[in-house]
C-alpha cells in the first residue's frame, strides 16, 4: 500500500505540474495573438473585455504556479501535510488549465480552433 500511495501522489504532482505547463502555453499563445491582432482599427489588447479575460488567465496561472511550488516544497521536505498540498495543487492547476485554455480559445476566436495556434 505504501508504494501505491507514493505512486499515486507522484502522479498527482506530475498532473499538477503538467497542468501548469498547459496554462503557461495558453497564456503565451494568447499574449502573442492579442498583441498582434487588430480589430476595429485597434489592437485586441486595447479592448477592455480582452484585458479582463487575459488578466483572469494570468491570475489563474499564477495561482496554479504558487500551488505547484508549495506542493513541491512540501514534497521535498516530506512535510506531514504533503498529500493535502499535492491534492490541492492538482485540483487548482487542472481546473486552471481547462479555464485558461478555454479563455485562450475565446481570445483567438476562430483561430483558437486552428491547429496552428495549439490552444484547444
Model features per residue range: what roles?
Residues 6-120:
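Alpha-helical interface subdomain recognition
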Residues 1-3:
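Long, acidic (Asp/Glu-rich), low-complexity accessory segments flanking structured domains
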Amino acid at each position: 500500500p505504501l508504494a501505491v500511495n507514493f505512486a499515486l501522489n507522484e502522479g498527482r504532482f506530475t498532473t499538477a505540474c503538467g497542468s501548469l505547463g498547459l496554462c503557461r502555453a495558453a497564456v503565451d499563445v494568447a499574449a502573442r495573438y492579442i498583441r498582434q491582432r487588430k480589430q476595429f482599427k485597434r489592437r485586441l489588447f486595447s479592448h477592455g473585455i480582452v484585458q479582463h479575460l487575459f488578466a483572469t488567465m494570468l491570475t489563474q496561472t499564477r495561482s496554479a504556479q504558487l500551488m505547484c511550488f508549495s506542493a513541491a516544497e512540501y514534497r521535498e521536505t516530506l512535510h506531514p501535510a504533503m498529500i493535502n498540498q499535492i491534492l490541492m495543487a492538482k485540483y487548482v492547476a487542472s481546473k486552471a488549465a481547462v479555464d485558461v485554455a478555454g479563455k485562450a480559445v475565446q481570445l483567438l476566436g476562430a483561430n483558437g480552433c486552428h491547429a496552428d495556434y495549439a490552444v484547444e
